Amino acid sequence: MKVTAAFASLLLTAFAAPAPEPVLVSRSAGINYVQNYNGNLGDFTYDESTGTFSMYWEDGVSSDFVVGLGWTTGSSKSITYSAQYSASSSSSYLAVYGWVNSPQAEYYIVEDYGDYNPCSSATSLGTVYSDGSTYQVCTDTRTNAPSITGTSTFTQYFSVRESTRTSGTVTIANHFNFWAQHGFGNSNFNYQVMAVEAWNGAGSASVTISS
């Protein structure tokens, strides 16, 4: 639910991006999980029945938030989405986001981001090519940090798209298989969502998921 260790302190302050429109994310096929970590820091609305959500945030946010819709149990299936995302002056991600239970890991497939690339301050694992672009791949270790089990120490995995986009198909298996060469469990999944995260600035996003 947070970024790299080097920026952990930022996550305790504010989260936002430039602010025109609300964030709408939709995936009508089997949506059964609402990710709402500090969604009260902005204007977060959702409708599970249609697979849509919106998030709008302004300057002055006091902490990190992660909001989105998805599934209680993740998988390597592909996700197709389209989005409107405005976060150029915010530390923010538009990403496939989830957790693995054991070995515990937090993961992001970052399709677009604001003013902060998480791989700029993490350990590089190289690159992987998927869905028409190279992705930078990196990892970090969070120590005594908030997690799905309370406070724990766990590994983060990031794939950050070099040719950023706000629509397309994410072939999740390509990332999971690459990460698995570097300790990623690739099984025993916890939840998985299409998410928006931010911790400063102001912004908005709208996403429709169809897979």
From Swiss-Prot:
Q: In which pathway does it act?
A: Glycan degradation; xylan degradation
Task: Spell out the subcellular localization from the entry.
Answer: Secreted
Catalyzed chemical reaction(s):
Endohydrolysis of (1->4)-beta-D-xylosidic linkages in xylans
Q: Which residues form the signal peptide?
A: 1-16
GO terms (molecular function) for this protein are: endo-1,4-beta-xylanase activity
Q: Which domain of life is it from?
A: Eukaryota
Name the UniProt key words of this record, in alphabetical order: Carbohydrate metabolism, Glycosidase, Hydrolase, Polysaccharide degradation, Secreted, Signal, Xylan degradation
Catalytic machinery residues: 106, 197
The kind of enzyme this is, by top-level EC class, is hydrolase
Q: Which GO terms of the cellular component aspect does the record hold? A: extracellular region
Which Enzyme Commission number(s) are listed? 3.2.1.8
Output the PROSITE patterns linked to this UniProt entry: GH11_1, GH11_3
Record flagged with keyword Glycosyltransferase: no
Q: Name one GO biological process term.
A: xylan catabolic process
Q: Which family does it belong to?
A: Belongs to the glycosyl hydrolase 11 (cellulase G) family.
General function of this protein: Endo-1,4-beta-xylanase involved in the hydrolysis of xylan, a major structural heterogeneous polysaccharide found in plant biomass representing the second most abundant polysaccharide in the biosphere, after cellulose.
> Could you tell me what this protein is called?
Probable endo-1,4-beta-xylanase 5
